[in-house]
Amino acid sequence: MRAYYKHLKSLLAAAVLLVGTNTHSQAFPPGTFSVDGIPVACGGVWFVLNPNLPDVGMADGQGRIFLNSVVLGQLPTMLKLYWISHECGHYFVGSDEDAADCWAIRLGRDQGWFPPEAFQLLLQMFQNNPGDVRHPSGPQRVSNMMQCYSSQ
């Protein structure tokens, strides 16, 4: 009977998760998501692919990371992993964008999937970004990223 309730609880959690997504979204429970054949995990966080998301990705603070599948599909693997790690980083360092950038950059550098040439692509992607209310300007972000990549 206990197993029945555990299974029912998982099904209800999945149903609640899917209610907040559109019909084109795909939800992946913890431990089931991969990028270009590389398994990706962020603790107990679900990944939700949504082609209509108005950003590359976002962490909702409720155990979900939403990713724009169209935008991600246009990026090389290392940049996909950066964005996923950046959003995952918000679960570890909070809402600070510079801290999430730094967390993702160091993770990629230390795990070996973010070599210097891939890091240069990231800097190019951000250098002319104007920023917004929540995100620093491109030059500020690039400066922070360079410090993170070169520091321990």
Task: List each model region and its residues.
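Auxiliary, metal-adjacent structural segments of Zn-dependent hydrolase domains
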Residues: 24-61
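Active-site scaffold of zinc-dependent metalloenzymes
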Residues: 48-77, 88-91
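Active-site recognition of the HExxH zinc-binding catalytic motif
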Residues: 82-91, 101
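An active-site-proximal "capping" alpha-helix that borders the catalytic cofactor pocket
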Residues: 95-111
